[in-house]
């Protein structure tokens, strides 16, 4: 690690808690000093000494077109020339809303926010207002932002009311949140049998991108939809990570499930700060000014993010875009798996559309993880070794074994081959250790 980078981190720690503005950036999970970046272009991100890294984080998902895409940058420059924020309705937010509703059939109306956390927080408030119920259900290992109701883990029993995972969250808030195992249809049935008439909503990542990448069974989703419908609960898909990433229609299109509400993140603004939640018209009509559920934001639907999103959707909706993106992921992940197998490394992978996951499992008999407990059983030290080996070779992966990877359309065959070659070298070293 360069002395300059260590100096930057020390300087940051003087006035920024932990030296970062989001905990995962601190490299606490993998060890070492975080790298400070100052620019990016295409498939690559550059540190402050202008060393290039092939980037598979993509600002945690939204850089699906690659960094600094000319069309997006041009749209943002033109938007900035016209004024940064108006605090009024604009035609641009209507265009983005129309486009999302056209692409995602379950979304009949949509409201813009400034972040994914705002989107999930608002969707839950809306579900509670719509149903006139208090309890919400979430799943172990799913992350939905840092609002108080969602920073909750399972209690001592599987169907207990949750307890906070963060200091500063009152127990009175947490008592309304029920946390159950992910990808477990029976747990859903048991939960509704016990609490059904009190449950306002169930919120989940339809593909979990915050426990690396766990793809649940079709039965899991079918059970969720059936139980929510039977008990009058609102089904909320948090597609902040999967929306427009695993496919144009998101995870809900992949599974053929229509949620009642869907949350989106910064991908709809091509990486600028933005979020959204939308769904059935009768539910969305409960939002102010039409209904009694209050939600607002000075920067919601800001013109820079909306105009960037309009430019991005032009490419996402082009014929063959997701076929090409998926082929790149197949190339990378299949190469990883082949290299791991060659050297006897116990690695399992998942992939769909532009997302992928890698798990260093304990032994050759262990299959790909199916839930949070499975992920926590993986070899975190081996992942850390892999992460730093890749970083030393100019490959930037998420600095956590619990985060998914992302491909952009700008990753070239040369980028992918270089990444596979680096992985092969590290696996060879691991095999000798």
Curated annotation (Swiss-Prot):
Homodimer. InterPro entries: 4pyrrol_synth_GluAld_NH2Trfase, Aminotrans_3, Aminotrans_3_PPA_site, PyrdxlP-dep_Trfase, PyrdxlP-dep_Trfase_major, PyrdxlP-dep_Trfase_small. It comes from the Bacteria. It is an enzyme of class 5 (isomerase). GO terms for cellular component: cytoplasm. Keywords: Cytoplasm, Isomerase, Porphyrin biosynthesis, Pyridoxal phosphate. Pathway: Porphyrin-containing compound metabolism; protoporphyrin-IX biosynthesis; 5-aminolevulinate from L-glutamyl-tRNA(Glu): step 2/2. It catalyses: (S)-4-amino-5-oxopentanoate = 5-aminolevulinate. Its EC number is 5.4.3.8. GO terms for biological process: protoporphyrinogen IX biosynthetic process. Its cofactor is pyridoxal 5'-phosphate. The keyword Lyase does not apply. It is found in: Cytoplasm. The modification N6-(pyridoxal phosphate)lysine is found at residue 266. This is Glutamate-1-semialdehyde 2,1-aminomutase. Belongs to the class-III pyridoxal-phosphate-dependent aminotransferase family. HemL subfamily. One of its GO terms (molecular function) is transaminase activity.
């Amino acid at each position: 690690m360069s002395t300059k980078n260590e100096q930057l981190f020390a300087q940051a720690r003087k006035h920024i808690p932990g030296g970062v503005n989001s905990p995962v950036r601190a490299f606490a999970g993998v060890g070492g000093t975080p790298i400070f970046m100052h620019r990016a272009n295409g498939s690559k991100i550059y540190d402050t000494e202008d060393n290039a890294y092939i980037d598979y984080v993509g600002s945690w998902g939204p850089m699906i077109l690659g960094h600094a895409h000319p069309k997006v940058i041009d749209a943002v420059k033109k938007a900035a020339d016209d004024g940064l924020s108006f605090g009024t309705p604009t035609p641009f937010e209507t265009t983005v809303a129309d486009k999302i509703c056209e692409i995602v059939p379950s979304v009949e109306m949509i409201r813009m926010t400034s972040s994914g956390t705002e989107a999930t927080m608002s969707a839950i408030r809306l579900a509670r207002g719509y149903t006139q119920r208090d309890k919400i259900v979430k799943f172990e290992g799913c992350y939905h932002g840092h609002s108080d109701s969602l920073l909750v883990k399972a209690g001592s029993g599987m169907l207990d009311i949750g307890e906070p995972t963060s200091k500063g969250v009152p127990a009175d808030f947490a008592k309304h949140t029920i946390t159950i195992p992910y990808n477990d249809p029976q747990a859903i049935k048991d939960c509704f049998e016990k609490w059904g008439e009190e449950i306002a909503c169930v919120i989940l990542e339809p593909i979990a991108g915050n426990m690396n990448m766990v793809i649940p069974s079709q039965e899991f989703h079918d059970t969720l939809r059936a139980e929510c419908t039977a008990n009058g609960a609102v089904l909320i898909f948090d597609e902040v990570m999967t929306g427009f990433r695993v496919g144009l229609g998101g995870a809900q299109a992949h599974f053929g499930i229509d949620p009642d509400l869907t949350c989106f993140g910064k991908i709809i603004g091509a990486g600028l700060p933005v979020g959204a939640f939308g769904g059935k018209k009768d539910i969305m009509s409960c939002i102010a000014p039409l209904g009694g559920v209050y939600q607002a934001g000075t920067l919601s639907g800001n013109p820079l993010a909306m105009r960037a999103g309009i430019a991005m959707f032009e490419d996402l909706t082009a014929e063959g875009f997701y076929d090409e993106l998926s082929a790149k992921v197949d190339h990378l992940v299949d190469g990883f798996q082949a290299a791991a197998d060659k050297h006897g490394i116990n690695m399992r992978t998942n992939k769909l559309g532009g997302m992928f996951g890698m798990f260093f499992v304990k032994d050759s008999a262990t299959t790909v993880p199916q839930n949070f407990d499975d992920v926590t059983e993986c070899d975190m030290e081996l992942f850390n070794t892999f992460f730093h080996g890749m970083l030393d070779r100019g490959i930037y992966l998420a600095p956590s074994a619990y985060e998914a990877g992302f491909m952009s359309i700008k990753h070239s065959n040369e980028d992918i081959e270089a990444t596979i070659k680096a992985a092969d070298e590290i696996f060879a070293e691991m095999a000798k250790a």
